[in-house]
């Protein structure tokens, strides 16, 4: 009551809403002039509007008789814009800048909160505004002057060239046919600035008649600002409760609603989370946390949430691993996504991450190199998989992030059994894709009914010592066999040693040893000393059956060898020079893009890959690396395509012979050697092509591809 007495009602005013000009009333603002300097008394020559864009242009006269007007400058501007000859299209017909154009710009797109008010005879009449425009002077005449200047220069140049040339040269015209436009391309085109400008230009101008403030037509139109209805029945918009009237008078601004503090992408607002459906809450939580026990999930969702509904929802977005829930791979890697590290598609990433999750269902520990060797993915992708659900331990590997949740396993045996069936299906798929041998795979625990036993570091060391002692005799025999091979290979280079044919059992055993000797791996090979110049085993090189350019025996009848040879030939036709390390990397990328169950997944050893390279018409280049080089053995094996069938074969062969004696060479030496061998001086383009095919430049020197050490 005290507040009401201090703030008494002075007067009550009736408010009316006028609608006659609701869709036609604009507010013009002139921000470059103070309010005291209006344009009311200045003659308005023309006016036009684009209603859809709410764009207005006004032409106002300039007082050329004013003592402040610079007549010489006005004549110069008119001359620059229209030129010396005046016609109907001239901007300034009087050859003097006697008018000025004003262009509008929108101050706000939301004018629903603004109205024009007229107070008369104790009544307040409101008319909603259709637009609020700010008009500023336009300097488009300067653009016209620049265009005229360019036209005059072009005409002068054309006149000079026409005197020099008797007839115009024939010009080549390129004809292009547009392909069908995709939906994404159409959306990008529609949202482009060029398209919007073209669309705005297509709307025609509507020419208007301007009437001054004191004109009788203006007085007549001003009457429409008053509400025409005499009774209050027609103004039902204002017959509202106080709260509804206040909401109509001051509606919440959309800009204010959107202007909320935005948290970082890795921070989840629990207040916003509560507004989502339960299934979306579970999905958002698992996508952010990656790994979570069921008890923690229930505590985040709140005490009022039904655990049965949560169990039903969690199984749609996560898998059970050691009693804990791990988000599914397809949630993290949607269908159209790819790896930021290697560019691998989402399907390959999901398959690799499922393999990591499956490995953790078998053991608490996972070794990253083993995962990379099976999945053929780069180290960064595998590290991302492991960081989602594990923590690294020095000299041990990656350990699962959370302890085994035995309580959940005992409390929900039906869920555990269902998850066990799902993992069985995933295991079968992984066996088929990665060609895993079932006999060597660890047996899955029945329903994950008990925690996986932990093995201490001392036990692991003791187990390794025991296995080493058991294999000691086998290793001794293997060492003796290799010594004999080396001794036989170095007896006499010209002596051919006769080899007795093996029985079928011995041949199978030898072939198995050869495949186990050099598995396809990203680690550097330690058996370089057992290879000859071209990367072949000592026993086979002595026989001379697989030297440079000769086919691999059995390639025609071996589909794996044929597929491998096709890959090698296609790769060297593009690259010309490759190290063994780079070739293995490209082969792993090729495997990752093949469909599941492809024949190349059966296993390709380093020896088989090198034999195929030599059989495809390539040769090994014995690059003399410096003694202090940090290159691995695989990086020191350099192979090059000897003959590709084009005109540059001879040039490339000369270049490769140069690098068989030099680790790095200057360009002038290469060019002089090419000129000497070919009998004629090669053009710069021909030398550049040969260098681009086989070499890279670093510090003013040229190296074979893959041999530059950072």
Swiss-Prot record:
Biased composition (Basic and acidic residues): 146-155
Keywords: Antiviral defense, DNA-directed RNA polymerase, Immunity, Innate immunity, Isopeptide bond, Nucleus, Phosphoprotein, Transcription, Ubl conjugation
Predominant place of localization: nucleus
Region spans: Disordered: 146-169, 498-526
Name of the protein described by the UniProt record: DNA-directed RNA polymerase III subunit RPC5
Localisation per UniProt entry: Nucleus
Gene Ontology biological process: defense response to virus; DNA-templated transcription; innate immune response
Function: DNA-dependent RNA polymerase catalyzes the transcription of DNA into RNA using the four ribonucleoside triphosphates as substrates. Specific peripheric component of RNA polymerase III (Pol III) which synthesizes small non-coding RNAs including 5S rRNA, snRNAs, tRNAs and miRNAs from at least 500 distinct genomic loci. Assembles with POLR3D/RPC4 forming a subcomplex that binds the Pol III core. Enables recruitment of Pol III at transcription initiation site and drives transcription initiation from both type 2 and type 3 DNA promoters.
Chain residue numbers at which the record places covalent cross-link Glycyl lysine isopeptide (Lys-Gly) (interchain with G-Cter in SUMO1): 498
Phosphotyrosine PTM sites in chain numbering: 224
Species of the source: Mus musculus
GO cellular component, one term: nucleoplasm
Ranges for region Required for Pol III complex stability: 558-710
Phylogenetic lineage: Eukaryota, Metazoa, Chordata, Craniata, Vertebrata
Cross-link for Glycyl lysine isopeptide (Lys-Gly) (interchain with G-Cter in SUMO2), residue positions: 171, 432, 498, 661
Pfam families, per the entry: RPC5, RPC5_C
Residue list for modification Phosphoserine: 161-162, 192, 503
Phosphoprotein as UniProt keyword: yes
Annotated Acidic residues bias: 502-520
